[in-house]
Amino acid sequence: MSANLDKSLDEIIGSNKAGSNRARVGGTRGNGPRRVGKQVGSQRRSLPNRRGPIRKNTRAPPNAVARVAKLLDTTREVKVNVEGLPRDIKQDAVREFFASQVGGVQRVLLSYNERGQSTGMANITFKNGELARRAVERFNGSPIDGGRSRLRLNLIVDPNQRPVKSLADRIKAMPQKGGNAPRPVKRGPNRKAAMAKSQNKPKREKPAKKSLEDLDKEMADYFEKK
Protein backbone atom coordinates (compact mmCIF):
# COMPACT_ATOMS: atom_id res chain seq x y z
CA MET A 1 0.00 0.00 0.00
CA SER A 2 2.97 2.30 0.49
CA ALA A 3 3.49 2.30 -3.28
CA ASN A 4 0.16 4.11 -3.60
CA LEU A 5 1.66 7.26 -2.15
CA ASP A 6 3.22 8.04 -5.53
CA LYS A 7 0.01 7.23 -7.44
CA SER A 8 -3.22 9.16 -7.75
CA LEU A 9 -6.59 7.66 -6.88
CA ASP A 10 -7.44 7.64 -10.59
CA GLU A 11 -4.44 5.40 -11.42
CA ILE A 12 -5.23 2.99 -8.58
CA ILE A 13 -8.85 2.45 -9.67
CA GLY A 14 -7.96 2.24 -13.39
CA SER A 15 -5.31 -0.45 -12.93
CA ASN A 16 -7.53 -2.50 -10.64
CA LYS A 17 -10.38 -2.63 -13.15
CA ALA A 18 -8.11 -4.23 -15.79
CA GLY A 19 -6.72 -6.75 -13.29
CA SER A 20 -10.16 -7.84 -12.13
CA ASN A 21 -11.25 -8.61 -15.72
CA ARG A 22 -8.21 -10.90 -16.30
CA ALA A 23 -8.89 -12.71 -13.04
CA ARG A 24 -12.44 -13.51 -14.12
CA VAL A 25 -11.32 -15.03 -17.46
CA GLY A 26 -8.68 -17.34 -15.94
CA GLY A 27 -10.72 -18.34 -12.93
CA THR A 28 -12.67 -21.20 -14.54
CA ARG A 29 -13.29 -24.36 -12.59
CA GLY A 30 -10.84 -27.23 -13.18
CA ASN A 31 -11.45 -30.95 -13.48
CA GLY A 32 -10.71 -31.81 -9.87
CA PRO A 33 -12.13 -34.70 -7.85
CA ARG A 34 -15.81 -34.52 -7.10
CA ARG A 35 -17.14 -34.67 -3.60
CA VAL A 36 -19.32 -37.62 -2.70
CA GLY A 37 -22.07 -37.18 -0.15
CA LYS A 38 -21.89 -39.18 3.04
CA GLN A 39 -24.23 -42.16 3.35
CA VAL A 40 -25.78 -43.65 6.44
CA GLY A 41 -25.97 -47.43 5.94
CA SER A 42 -27.22 -48.14 2.42
CA GLN A 43 -29.32 -44.98 2.10
CA ARG A 44 -28.35 -41.36 1.77
CA ARG A 45 -29.29 -39.02 4.53
CA SER A 46 -32.51 -37.38 3.49
CA LEU A 47 -33.16 -33.78 4.32
CA PRO A 48 -36.52 -32.58 5.53
CA ASN A 49 -38.78 -31.05 2.91
CA ARG A 50 -38.46 -27.29 3.10
CA ARG A 51 -40.39 -24.75 1.17
CA GLY A 52 -37.44 -22.39 1.01
CA PRO A 53 -36.62 -19.19 2.85
CA ILE A 54 -39.35 -16.74 3.58
CA ARG A 55 -38.95 -13.72 1.38
CA LYS A 56 -39.21 -10.38 3.06
CA ASN A 57 -40.66 -7.38 1.35
CA THR A 58 -37.65 -5.11 1.07
CA ARG A 59 -39.26 -2.70 -1.33
CA ALA A 60 -39.50 0.88 -0.16
CA PRO A 61 -42.95 2.46 0.04
CA PRO A 62 -43.97 4.20 -3.20
CA ASN A 63 -44.26 7.51 -1.39
CA ALA A 64 -40.64 7.32 -0.20
CA VAL A 65 -39.39 6.39 -3.68
CA ALA A 66 -41.25 9.33 -5.21
CA ARG A 67 -39.84 11.72 -2.61
CA VAL A 68 -36.27 10.51 -3.18
CA ALA A 69 -36.63 10.86 -6.96
CA LYS A 70 -38.03 14.36 -6.53
CA LEU A 71 -35.14 15.39 -4.29
CA LEU A 72 -32.58 14.03 -6.74
CA ASP A 73 -34.16 15.94 -9.62
CA THR A 74 -33.89 19.27 -7.83
CA THR A 75 -30.85 21.54 -7.77
CA ARG A 76 -30.19 21.00 -4.06
CA GLU A 77 -26.90 19.56 -2.79
CA VAL A 78 -26.76 15.78 -2.26
CA LYS A 79 -24.21 13.85 -0.17
CA VAL A 80 -22.57 10.56 -1.08
CA ASN A 81 -20.98 8.28 1.52
CA VAL A 82 -17.79 6.57 0.27
CA GLU A 83 -16.25 3.53 2.03
CA GLY A 84 -13.17 1.46 1.19
CA LEU A 85 -10.81 4.29 0.23
CA PRO A 86 -7.06 3.61 0.58
CA ARG A 87 -6.04 4.86 4.00
CA ASP A 88 -2.88 6.50 2.72
CA ILE A 89 -4.84 8.77 0.34
CA LYS A 90 -5.28 12.36 1.48
CA GLN A 91 -8.48 14.39 1.43
CA ASP A 92 -7.28 16.64 -1.39
CA ALA A 93 -6.64 13.59 -3.58
CA VAL A 94 -10.23 12.42 -3.06
CA ARG A 95 -11.53 15.87 -4.01
CA GLU A 96 -9.39 16.07 -7.15
CA PHE A 97 -10.38 12.57 -8.29
CA PHE A 98 -14.16 13.03 -8.07
CA ALA A 99 -13.96 16.62 -9.36
CA SER A 100 -12.16 15.42 -12.51
CA GLN A 101 -14.22 12.26 -13.05
CA VAL A 102 -17.70 13.53 -12.11
CA GLY A 103 -17.54 17.26 -11.37
CA GLY A 104 -19.64 19.48 -9.15
CA VAL A 105 -17.83 18.60 -5.89
CA GLN A 106 -18.77 21.13 -3.23
CA ARG A 107 -17.17 19.65 -0.09
CA VAL A 108 -15.18 16.56 0.95
CA LEU A 109 -14.96 15.38 4.55
CA LEU A 110 -12.54 12.51 5.18
CA SER A 111 -13.04 10.55 8.41
CA TYR A 112 -10.14 10.04 10.86
CA ASN A 113 -9.78 7.91 13.99
CA GLU A 114 -8.55 9.05 17.40
CA ARG A 115 -4.92 8.59 16.25
CA GLY A 116 -5.40 10.97 13.33
CA GLN A 117 -5.32 8.15 10.76
CA SER A 118 -7.76 7.88 7.87
CA THR A 119 -10.56 5.33 8.24
CA GLY A 120 -11.09 5.06 4.47
CA MET A 121 -14.52 6.70 4.73
CA ALA A 122 -15.55 10.09 3.34
CA ASN A 123 -18.66 12.18 2.76
CA ILE A 124 -18.69 13.98 -0.58
CA THR A 125 -21.22 16.75 -1.24
CA PHE A 126 -22.16 17.22 -4.88
CA LYS A 127 -23.81 20.23 -6.45
CA ASN A 128 -27.02 18.38 -7.37
CA GLY A 129 -28.61 14.95 -7.33
CA GLU A 130 -27.74 14.10 -10.93
CA LEU A 131 -23.98 14.38 -10.29
CA ALA A 132 -24.27 12.36 -7.07
CA ARG A 133 -26.18 9.61 -8.87
CA ARG A 134 -23.56 9.57 -11.65
CA ALA A 135 -20.75 9.09 -9.12
CA VAL A 136 -22.53 6.12 -7.52
CA GLU A 137 -23.23 4.47 -10.87
CA ARG A 138 -19.62 4.82 -12.09
CA PHE A 139 -17.57 3.93 -9.01
CA ASN A 140 -19.72 1.79 -6.71
CA GLY A 141 -17.97 -1.60 -6.52
CA SER A 142 -14.71 -0.46 -8.16
CA PRO A 143 -11.70 -2.59 -7.02
CA ILE A 144 -8.92 -1.00 -4.98
CA ASP A 145 -5.31 -2.24 -4.55
CA GLY A 146 -5.57 -5.23 -6.88
CA GLY A 147 -9.02 -6.24 -5.70
CA ARG A 148 -8.19 -6.40 -1.99
CA SER A 149 -11.11 -4.09 -1.33
CA ARG A 150 -13.83 -2.35 -3.26
CA LEU A 151 -15.33 1.10 -3.15
CA ARG A 152 -18.85 1.39 -1.75
CA LEU A 153 -20.82 4.52 -2.58
CA ASN A 154 -24.25 5.27 -1.11
CA LEU A 155 -26.53 8.25 -1.62
CA ILE A 156 -27.52 10.08 1.56
CA VAL A 157 -31.08 11.34 1.01
CA ASP A 158 -33.73 12.14 3.61
CA PRO A 159 -37.14 11.39 2.00
CA ASN A 160 -38.91 13.43 4.69
CA GLN A 161 -36.92 16.53 3.84
CA ARG A 162 -38.99 19.22 2.17
CA PRO A 163 -37.63 21.10 -0.84
CA VAL A 164 -36.23 24.49 0.05
CA LYS A 165 -38.19 27.44 -1.32
CA SER A 166 -36.40 30.14 -3.24
CA LEU A 167 -35.62 33.47 -1.59
CA ALA A 168 -38.17 35.23 -3.80
CA ASP A 169 -40.92 32.91 -2.54
CA ARG A 170 -39.98 33.46 1.11
CA ILE A 171 -39.71 37.29 1.12
CA LYS A 172 -42.80 39.49 0.84
CA ALA A 173 -42.57 43.18 0.00
CA MET A 174 -43.77 45.76 2.55
CA PRO A 175 -46.97 47.68 1.68
CA GLN A 176 -46.22 51.03 0.07
CA LYS A 177 -47.09 54.25 1.90
CA GLY A 178 -47.94 57.69 0.49
CA GLY A 179 -49.20 58.62 -2.96
CA ASN A 180 -48.22 55.34 -4.58
CA ALA A 181 -50.58 53.37 -2.38
CA PRO A 182 -54.02 52.76 -3.92
CA ARG A 183 -56.73 54.92 -2.38
CA PRO A 184 -59.95 53.39 -1.16
CA VAL A 185 -62.92 53.97 -3.47
CA LYS A 186 -65.63 56.13 -1.91
CA ARG A 187 -69.10 54.86 -2.42
CA GLY A 188 -72.19 57.08 -2.52
CA PRO A 189 -75.24 56.61 -0.29
CA ASN A 190 -77.44 53.68 -1.00
CA ARG A 191 -80.75 54.87 -2.45
CA LYS A 192 -82.75 51.94 -1.19
CA ALA A 193 -81.50 52.45 2.36
CA ALA A 194 -82.28 56.19 2.21
CA MET A 195 -85.83 55.57 0.97
CA ALA A 196 -86.48 52.97 3.66
CA LYS A 197 -85.16 55.35 6.32
CA SER A 198 -87.42 58.19 5.14
CA GLN A 199 -90.46 55.93 5.17
CA ASN A 200 -89.86 54.89 8.76
CA LYS A 201 -89.85 58.50 10.02
CA PRO A 202 -93.24 59.82 11.34
CA LYS A 203 -94.84 62.31 8.99
CA ARG A 204 -95.57 65.82 10.29
CA GLU A 205 -99.19 66.92 10.13
CA LYS A 206 -99.75 69.97 7.96
CA PRO A 207 -101.65 72.90 9.64
CA ALA A 208 -105.21 73.35 8.45
CA LYS A 209 -105.93 76.31 6.22
CA LYS A 210 -107.67 79.28 7.96
CA SER A 211 -110.44 81.39 6.50
CA LEU A 212 -110.51 85.22 6.39
CA GLU A 213 -112.91 85.32 9.31
CA ASP A 214 -110.54 83.29 11.43
CA LEU A 215 -107.67 85.59 10.55
CA ASP A 216 -109.71 88.72 11.40
CA LYS A 217 -110.72 87.22 14.69
CA GLU A 218 -107.11 86.40 15.60
CA MET A 219 -106.09 89.97 14.73
CA ALA A 220 -108.85 91.43 16.90
CA ASP A 221 -107.85 89.20 19.82
CA TYR A 222 -104.23 90.22 19.41
CA PHE A 223 -104.97 93.98 19.62
CA GLU A 224 -107.34 93.55 22.55
CA LYS A 225 -104.63 91.87 24.57
CA LYS A 226 -102.37 94.83 24.02
Curated annotation (Swiss-Prot):
Its main location: nucleus. InterPro entries: ALYREF_mRNA_export (IPR051229), Nucleotide-bd_a/b_plait_sf (IPR012677), RBD_domain_sf (IPR035979), RRM_dom (IPR000504), Yra1/Mlo3_RRM (IPR034357). One of its GO terms (cellular component) is transcription export complex. The modification Phosphoserine is found at S8, S100. It is found in: Nucleus. Residues 208-226 have a biased composition (Basic and acidic residues). GO terms for molecular function: DNA/RNA hybrid binding; mRNA binding; RNA binding; RNA helicase inhibitor activity. PROSITE patterns: RRM. Keywords: Acetylation, Nucleus, Phosphoprotein, RNA-binding, Transcription, Transcription regulation. One of its GO terms (biological process) is mRNA export from nucleus. The modification N-acetylserine is found at S2. Component of the transcription/export (TREX) complex, which is at least is formed of SUB2, TEX1 and YRA1 and the THO complex composed of HPR1, MFT1, THO2 and THP1. Interacts with RDS3 and YRA2. RNA-binding RNA annealing protein. May have a role in pre-mRNA metabolism. Component the TREX complex, which operates in coupling transcription elongation to mRNA export. This is RNA annealing protein YRA1. It comes from Saccharomyces cerevisiae (strain ATCC 204508 / S288c). The lineage of its organism: Eukaryota, Fungi, Dikarya, Ascomycota, Saccharomycotina. The gene is YRA1.
